[in-house]
Amino acid sequence: MNSAAIAVRPISTETVLQNHLRAAKIGVDAIMEDYTDESVLITHEATYRGLAEIRRFFTTLFGALPRGFFDELQLIRHEIVDEVAYILWERKPQIARATDTFVVRNGKILVQTFAVMQ
């Protein structure tokens, strides 16, 4: 069989989301594997563009959270529509509700929004 005829199956939005949720339990280096230098993360405080800015956001976030924080995260809602993933989650008592929306392209997070509701 000609190697050019072998198709590479694209990584699904669901796969990227599940990897992202697992990576959050591991740490910043693992979570950064889901992004590219074209990625954008939008929060209520700022917009972070590219790997360096997104890494800075997650380094600060992970430094402020107690060890094992993401192990206790409860997923309330999880919706995938084509290249868009939405999650609603809680981690009481610290976080009553939070949402993330992800736009996934080529197996990476292109755009993410993140908001916490107290």
Located regions from the model:
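Short, solvent-exposed loop/turn segments at secondary-structure boundaries
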Residues: 45-46
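Short, conserved phosphate/pyrophosphate- and ester-handling motifs at nucleotide-, phospho-/glycolipid
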Residues: 50
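Short, well-ordered alpha-helical segments enriched in acidic and aromatic residues
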Residues: 26-38
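A beta-strand edge to alpha-helix "cap/lid" segment located at domain peripheries
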Residues: 1-9, 18, 22-25, 42, ...
